[in-house]
Amino acid sequence: MKTQVAIIGAGPSGLLLGQLLHNAGIHTVILERQTPQYVLGRIRAGILESGTVDLLREAGVAQRMDAEGLVHHGVEFLFDGQRVPVALSELTDGKSVMVYGQTEVTRDLMAARAASGAPIVYGVSEVAIHDAKSDRPTITYLSEGETCRLECDFIAGCDGFHGVSRQSIPAGILQTYESVWPFGWLGLLADTPPVNPELIYAHHQRGFVLCSQRSLTRSRYYLQVPLSDKVEAWSDERFWQELKSRLPEELVSRLVTGHSLEKSIAPLRSFVVEPMQYGRLFLVGDAAHIVPPTGAKGLNLAASDVNYLWRILREYYHRGRSDLLAAYSQLALDRVWKGERFSWFMTRLLHDFLDQNAFDAKMQAADRRYYLGSRAGLTTIAENYVGLPMERVA
């Protein structure tokens, strides 16, 4: 089999890249290790930056998002007993974020892929990348027990942190930057109305809290917990009680509890590799970078990578511009590091660090008072939260 662009991974970044390239008349084949049901079963973030929303619209897959998604013009912070609203739109010349779950984004992209008739192969195994430095790289893989070979011009590695794409790059090429945070997030999804119209980020001496939502009838809550905790030790009742202990009474009185649809503990990690390309292999999204979820940047940074890569490939195929191929890594990384910085900043600002000394604790408190107590500080948070601009490719 032959194609122009081979895409490894059928998560939202791989599907979005495939859709944009398909719309531009560029042939793609997507390979995915899991089943469609497994991919849709992943519970992930649900906050879309304004630039991500625009990219989904550009791809022609935003009809349901625009009909069912919730536009948020603000967000709220809690600390030291204070509730601090952040007027996102007022502070960013009218920009906003969209509450629309990653599962729904993936569902829409899957439907668009199926409607296009463009090939996608699920359930592949033993995926291997060959000759990435040549002008005709190939991928071999097993599908339904048969060894298959896919020839292509370019490979997009959209297969996540544990995927084969990054691992296929020879040792000594990539520089890794990593920080593992000393706590995790315990998340609970429930079919209950959100406790607040806007998302709430709360600092508390017992640990950070995020009150999020997927719709007007589905809520997502997170608690900072020790890495040693096991999800089996957290009954629904224990979760709700701990959540109440970290929220003010005015919110507790409005909190609707219920049976959990999903509950899990996720470790927090900051991770980047440089460069994000090796020959004609391009790393996209989690294959190249991971952020703690505090800044809602994971899916949005993946979409940012897609934005740069699809435009570079369009220029190559439509205008013969091979000079832009080498620019992908630097373009993507410039925005990745800004997203990493904001995620690091939000995590440092709002979590409880048991091992920090008294001076660091005072500095953390001073940061909260400054950033959440001045228009300049609130503007910094707002412009990063709604998403920084993407550089033009051509």
Annotated model-derived regions:
Residues 22-43:
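Glycine-rich FAD pyrophosphate-binding loop
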Residues 2-5:
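Extreme N-terminal starter segment of soluble prokaryotic enzymes
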Residues 30-31, 157, 202, 284:
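Generic enzyme active-site microenvironment
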Residues 41-44, 49-116, 130, 340:
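Active-site-adjacent segment of FAD-dependent monooxygenases/related oxidoreductases
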Residues 253, 296, 311-394:
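C-terminal helical "tail/cap" subdomain of flavin- and related membrane-associated enzymes
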Residues 38, 159-160, 291:
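Glycine-rich, N-terminal phosphate-binding loop of Rossmann-like dinucleotide-binding domains
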Residues 8-23, 109, 262-345:
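Conserved mid-domain beta->alpha element of the FAD-binding
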Residues 111, 118, 124-128, 132-264, ...:
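Conserved FAD-binding catalytic core of PHBH/FMO-like flavoproteins
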